[in-house]
Amino acid sequence: MILYHGSFLEIAKPDLVHSRPNVDFGRGFYVTPLYEQAAKWCGKFKHRGKDGIISRYEYDESREDELKTLKFDSYSEKWLDFILNCRSGKDSTDYDLVVGGVANDKVFNTVELFFDGLIDKTEAINRLRYEKPNLQICFRTEKALSLLHFEGSETL
């Protein structure tokens, strides 16, 4: 499977050292099978006057059963709880790989309203139910990263 990472620089050797804490699926290297999603990730860098660079990887799916994986097929209560734990620094899970929806602008607004206590979980789930997830994959361990092979990059 081909996966993409959007940034301001080429990342030929992904690592976990540069990952940020308290994001959707916790510390890790984030990619997507959706080129358009990676291009959106580049947008914030382009707004700051930097180049947007999409790095491309081949992911060895045949070995995925070697990884402890968590997959979210939709925006759900389970997804929302996981995001809440990761974003608040309370994630203690040991998944190698987490797959699920991106908290894009509309989804992010709903998540923030829930985090701030302005809507309850039921209302948040009702709002998210109709959103089609943009897929992101978080490689959270070196074991998972070993299945990702750099193929090249392009500047937007």
Give a label for each model feature.
Residues 1-23:
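Short aromatic-glycine-(Arg/Gly/Cys) micro-motifs in beta-strand/loop hairpins
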Residues 3-5, 30-31, 56-58:
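Short, conserved beta-strand segments within well-ordered enzyme catalytic domains
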Residues 11-14, 35-40, 118-121:
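Short amphipathic alpha-helical surface micro-motifs
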Residues 20-44:
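Extended catalytic/binding region for NAD+/ADP-ribose chemistry, centered on the ART fold
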Residues 23-24, 44-156:
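Conserved NAD+-utilizing ADP-ribose enzyme module
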